[in-house]
Every structure is written in structure tokens, then in C-alpha cells.
Amino acid sequence: ADVGGPDLAIQPFSLAPETSGTASAFVRRVLKGEPLAYEVEIKSETTPALRQVAATPGSIYYTSVPLSVRQCSVKTIPIATKANRPFVTPYIEPRIPSSACPQQRNQINRDALKNNTYPLARRLFVITKKGDSVEAIAGRSYSNILLSAEGQMLIEAAGFVPTR
């Protein structure tokens, strides 16, 4: 489909699905378990990948919403689950243009993430060990910190959607 701009070849970038939870989820949910195409250039970390996207016309990359929405050098795009479904933005509309950045930055569309209308939203879990071992106690303590009011504020400050 015509999206405007010059007619460029698409250069996809990704983290390795074997080492990235986001890339693994993308392969599982979007590609239905099929491997990434050979054209996909694997990057070792998100920051260099975002820099490469900013420097490469026609490139595309996916990453967690908190790592991309507030960036000044790249544009996040709305996505839909099917051709007849509405596109949902990972940011609060209207989109703030990069020319206004860094004085103004796009904000995360927390409602779309919380109510799962953003198609690639996923939940993250803390899994702890059972029992009374030091590891189990530490895991429960960590969970309790995250579920506390202060923990929920820290989760939100990191760009994620609090659970409470």
C-alpha cells in the first residue's frame, strides 16, 4: 500500500529471537513461529538498532513501546491486527513531530496497552521459587516491592503499565 514518501526498499532490523523476549514474542505472535527472513539484519542491542533506523531510509525495527515512543530520531507507527481493523498508535495522539523534540516528546498510550487494543501489547510476569529458601524469600520480596504503591510508580516511570 502507498504510505507516502519515496519508493524505497524496506530494510528490516531485529534483535535475535534467541536472546530477546520482544523478538521471540514477535516471531511467535506475528510470524506464527516462522523464522525471520534472511533479509532481516540482526542487531545486538536496541540503542544501536534505533540509531541504525534513524540513519537508514526505508528501515524498520520493532521494540518495546517504552523504548521507542519517546525517541526523537525515529517515528513509531500505528498498527492493526487485520486489514479491516482500526490502526492503534503506541503513543497518545496527536503525534508530536520530531521537529518539536526534545522539548516535547510523544507519550505512551497506556490505555491501549492496558486494555489490549494495541495489537502487540504483552504482559510481563515475575515468577518466584516456592518454599522458604533465601531465593524464594528474595523473589517474594521483589514481587511485593513491585506491587507496592512505590513499585507501581517505578513501573510507570519506566514506561510500563502498572498492574494496580
Task: Identify the residue ranges that each predicted region occupies.
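Exported/periplasmic ABC-transporter solute-binding proteins
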Residues: 1-164
